[in-house]
Amino acid sequence: MFGGKGGMGNLMKQAQMMQDKMAKMQEEIARMEITGEAGAGLVKVTMTGSHSVRKVEIDPSLMEDDKEMLEDLIAAACNDASRRIEENQKNKMAEVTGGMQLPPGMKMPF
C-alpha cells in the first residue's frame, strides 16, 4: 500500500519535516508586523501576525475632522491590516505545504 516499510517510514519523515516547517512558519508569522491603511493612508494600523494592534497612526489633519469619520477610518484600517495578515499567512503556509489546498473553512494549523 505504501510501497513497503521504506515508503511508510519516508511518509512519516516527510510529515515530521512539514510539521517542523509549519512550527517555524507560525513563529515567523507571529513576529511579523503588517500595516493596514484607510483614507488613502491618513490612518494606519500596524498589527502583529497574531492580530495584536501594535501602533495606530493618525494624520494630524484628521484631528480637526468629525469624530465619527475618524472612528470609521480606524476600524477600516484595522480590517485592512487583518485582511493583509490573513493573506500573508495563506501565502506563507502555501510555501510550507507546497501549495496543497485545504478544504474551505479549514485553517492551518489544524
Swiss-Prot record:
It is found in: Cytoplasm, Nucleoid. Belongs to the YbaB/EbfC family. Its main location: cytoplasm. It comes from the Bacteria. Homodimer. Keywords: Cytoplasm, DNA-binding. HAMAP family: DNA_YbaB_EbfC (MF_00274). The keyword Manganese does not apply. Residues 90-110 are annotated as: Disordered. NCBIfam families: DNA_YbaB_EbfC. This is Nucleoid-associated protein Sden_2380. Binds to DNA and alters its conformation. May be involved in regulation of gene expression, nucleoid organization and DNA protection. It comes from Shewanella denitrificans (strain OS217 / ATCC BAA-1090 / DSM 15013). One of its GO terms (molecular function) is DNA binding. GO terms for cellular component: bacterial nucleoid; cytosol. InterPro entries: YbaB-like_sf, YbaB/EbfC. Disulfide bonds: none annotated.
